[in-house]
């Protein structure tokens, strides 16, 4: 009993009407449930159980009507296929070669009427507008059309009653399919009555369809003329004179009448006051329009959504709102900068025009102009072009190889002048002489220091001699006490000794203060140390790659991480079974210290606590094979760093380790270390 989708669509309007009569209101849920029952091929009992929660006591009556309609549609579909051809032929004989009916059917677009529409009590008619338009048909005109059609059918029926059985007509090429006449080539009275009723019903439906089309066209003023022509053609076909309806000119405004004093008056002369529209804020107008739009959305939900199976009318649809835009003020001096930029651009264009004009006069063209010329077409690999792209500017009209003596006019920009391009300095100055530092011996350094001190002493003596500065106090020591002071030392030796020792302490203090002033502070020493460790890597980064068989000892991990941080090295440590790769990046001095750490300072062959028990059980040969060690895989330079701060990465699989290196653009480090590990294991 399952129906196709097309049959379910035709059955849907009838089910909606039946549900509305049974429940008193339309319910899309019941309609959908009924269509599902019919579509799945349920019997009456299952369908009643399925629809009982929705219809309660009216379930059985509704199910009986539903299945009767399905059976009726199925029987009408089988009978329609058998009687379709004979009915078409008989209708043609009843109406003859009446061209008027064919015109009517061609002028109006036919509407397919479902077979379940006969069950409806009242046919649906599209309501027209309240005011009649010139292209619409009134009820009186439709009634006249019906009477004319009935009159024609009665006359044709009377003619058929006196006509003898017609002779078989030859087949015309206009007929698409040959149709056979009934036996005896005669029409029975009951059959003629059936044909007449069908024709009357079709004429009535055609008139209703035309009236609905006229009503729809009347709502569109731009299509009034076409609608009026269709209506007039149908009225002439039915033998009815169409009424003349004048089109009122509603587009013109009401004329303005002014009296002698200039006041606005109506037709009777009474003074009237016109409504003056006051300006309103744009924000208020937008707010009113927004509220009206929200109200319309609430009142009129879309029909497409209601017809959807999954539409829930309880859920409200929030309309999309435009975001508010804030004020954007121009910065001070913005337009002044734009004007200055335009003036500069104009001056530059003027200067370029003068330069190009001078170049045209002299015939000198820069090589950059030729370099900017691109080839006109792309050549495949291995193809030889007819002319090179740098020559295409000189020969714009092409190049003919058959011509023996080409004309001078064929070339562009060829003159007798010789162009001397301007000489440019190379980007890197390689002519600077490299001077090697001169290293002096200890004896030479002392001699140079004495000479410098002697020159400084002579300068002080000259200043004292000229009176620019007071003479310095004699530098008295215990050893030269008697020679410097002389008689004063003999008179009071204790006092002189105290004076000499005070001078010695004073000189010592000044010396220590000078040293303390030159001494760096703690912060300066720290910066100096960091600067010493952080080497210049602008010319390239030195990289070293190490491979360690076992790196499970946390003490060794800490040493690697701590020393890399102290030496300001970057890199990564990838932990994998039997292949632990350590990559470090930095300056040459730091790399030298880290290399000594990895290859000499750390004792890799020391047994760890967690593996000592296992090693005792293994044989000596296996212990030798699995001895832990560190190998320098590769060292070189690169342009930039690939890694950041030193970190440890645990990679259980080889693919995961390679992907980690590939993410930093250094997968070749892993490939090199892994290949060496494989070769070492095979030996």
Curated annotation (Swiss-Prot):
One example of a Gene Ontology biological process annotation: spliceosomal tri-snRNP complex assembly
Q: How is it modified after translation?
A: Ubiquitinated. Undergoes 'Lys-63'-linked polyubiquitination by PRPF19 and deubiquitination by USP4. 'Lys-63'-linked ubiquitination increases the affinity for PRPF8 and may regulate the assembly of the U4/U6-U5 tri-snRNP complex.
Q: Which residues in this protein are found as Phosphothreonine? A: 167
This protein is called U4/U6 small nuclear ribonucleoprotein Prp3
SMART domains reported in the protein's UniProt record:
PWI
Please give the subunit comment from the record. Component of the precatalytic spliceosome (spliceosome B complex). Component of the U4/U6-U5 tri-snRNP complex, a building block of the precatalytic spliceosome (spliceosome B complex). The U4/U6-U5 tri-snRNP complex is composed of the U4, U6 and U5 snRNAs and at least PRPF3, PRPF4, PRPF6, PRPF8, PRPF31, SNRNP200, TXNL4A, SNRNP40, SNRPB, SNRPD1, SNRPD2, SNRPD3, SNRPE, SNRPF, SNRPG, DDX23, CD2BP2, PPIH, SNU13, EFTUD2, SART1 and USP39, plus LSM2, LSM3, LSM4, LSM5, LSM6, LSM7 and LSM8. Interacts directly with PRPF4.
Answer whether the UniProt record assigns the keyword Phosphoprotein to this protein: yes
Q: Summarize the protein's role.
A: Plays a role in pre-mRNA splicing as component of the U4/U6-U5 tri-snRNP complex that is involved in spliceosome assembly, and as component of the precatalytic spliceosome (spliceosome B complex).
- One Gene Ontology term, aspect cellular component: nucleus
Q: Which residues form the PWI domain?
A: 1-87
Positions of post-translational Phosphoserine modification: 164, 619
Crosslink position(s): Glycyl lysine isopeptide (Lys-Gly) (interchain with G-Cter in SUMO2): 139, 244, 252
Upper classification of the organism: Eukaryota, Metazoa, Chordata, Craniata, Vertebrata
């Amino acid at each position: 009993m399952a129906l196709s989708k097309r049959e379910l669509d035709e059955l849907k309007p009838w089910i909606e009407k039946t549900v509305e009569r049974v429940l008193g209101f339309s319910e899309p849920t019941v309609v959908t449930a009924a269509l599902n029952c019919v579509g799945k091929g349920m019997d009456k009992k299952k369908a009643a159980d399925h629809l009982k929660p929705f219809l309660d006591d009216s379930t059985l009556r509704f199910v009986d009507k539903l299945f009767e309609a399905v059976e009726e549609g199925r029987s009408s579909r089988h009978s329609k296929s058998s009687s379709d051809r004979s009915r078409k032929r008989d209708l043609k004989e009843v109406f003859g070669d009446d061209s008027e009916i064919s015109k009517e059917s061609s002028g109006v677009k036919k509407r397919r009427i479902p077979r379940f529409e006969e069950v409806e009590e009242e046919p649906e008619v599209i309501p027209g507008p309240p005011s009649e338009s010139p292209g619409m048909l009134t009820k009186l005109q439709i009634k006249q059309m019906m009477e004319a059609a009935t009159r024609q059918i009665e006359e044709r029926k009377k003619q058929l009653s006196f006509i003898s059985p017609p002779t078989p007509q030859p087949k015309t090429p206009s007929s698409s399919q040959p149709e056979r006449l009934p036996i005896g080539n005669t029409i029975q009275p009951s059959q003629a009555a059936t044909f007449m009723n069908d024709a009357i019903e079709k004429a009535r439906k055609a008139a209703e369809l035309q009236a609905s089309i006229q009503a729809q066209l009347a709502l569109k003023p731009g299509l009034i003329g076409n609608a009026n022509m269709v209506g007039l053609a149908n009225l002439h076909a039915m033998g009815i004179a169409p009424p003349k309806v004048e089109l009122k000119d509603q587009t013109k405004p009401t004329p303005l009448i002014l009296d002698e004093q200039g006041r606005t008056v109506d037709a009777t002369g009474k003074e009237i006051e016109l409504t003056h529209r006051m300006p309103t804020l744009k924000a208020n107008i937008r707010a009113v329009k927004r509220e009206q739009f929200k109200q319309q959305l609430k009142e009129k939900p879309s029909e497409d959504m209601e017809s959807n199976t999954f539409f829930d009318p309880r859920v409200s649809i929030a309309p999309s709102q435009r975001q508010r835009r804030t004020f954007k003020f121009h910065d001070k001096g913005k337009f002044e900068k734009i004007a200055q930029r335009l003036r500069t651009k104009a001056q530059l264009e003027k200067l370029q025009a003068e330069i190009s004009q001078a170049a045209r006069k002299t015939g000198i063209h820069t090589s950059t102009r030729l370099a900017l010329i691109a080839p006109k077409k792309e050549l495949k690999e291995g193809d030889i072009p007819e002319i090179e792209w740098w020559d295409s500017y000189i020969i714009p009209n092409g190049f003919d190889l058959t011509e023996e003596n080409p004309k001078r006019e064929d070339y562009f920009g060829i003159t007798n002048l010789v162009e001397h391009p301007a000489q440019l300095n190379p980007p890197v100055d390689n002519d600077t002489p490299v001077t090697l530092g001169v290293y002096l011996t200890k004896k030479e350094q002392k001699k140079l220091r004495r000479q410098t001190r002697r020159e400084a002493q002579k300068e002080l003596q000259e200043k004292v001699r000229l009176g620019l500065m007071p003479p310095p106090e004699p530098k008295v020591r215990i050893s030269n006490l008697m020679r410097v002071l002389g008689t004063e030392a003999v008179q009071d030796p204790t006092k002189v000794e105290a004076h000499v020792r005070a001078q010695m302490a004073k000189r010592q203090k000044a010396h220590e203060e000078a040293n303390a002033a030159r001494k760096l502070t703690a912060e300066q020493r720290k910066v100096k140390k960091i600067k010493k460790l952080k080497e210049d890597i602008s010319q390239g980064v030195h990289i070293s790659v190490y491979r360690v068989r076992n790196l499970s000892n946390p003490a060794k991990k800490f040493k690697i991480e701590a020393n890399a941080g102290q030496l300001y090295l970057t890199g990564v440590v990838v932990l994998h079974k039997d292949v632990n790769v350590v990559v470090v990046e930095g300056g040459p001095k730091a790399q030298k210290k880290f290399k000594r750490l990895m290859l000499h300072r750390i004792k890799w062959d020391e047994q760890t606590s967690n593996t000592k028990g296992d090693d005792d059980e293994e044989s000596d040969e296996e212990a030798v094979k699995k001895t832990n060690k560190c190998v320098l895989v590769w060292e070189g330079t690169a342009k930039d760093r690939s890694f950041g701060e030193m970190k440890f990465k645990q990679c259980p699989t080889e693919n995961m380790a390679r992907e980690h290196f590939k993410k930093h653009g250094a997968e070749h480090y892993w490939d090199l270390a892994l290949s060496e590990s494989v070769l070492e294991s095979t030996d």
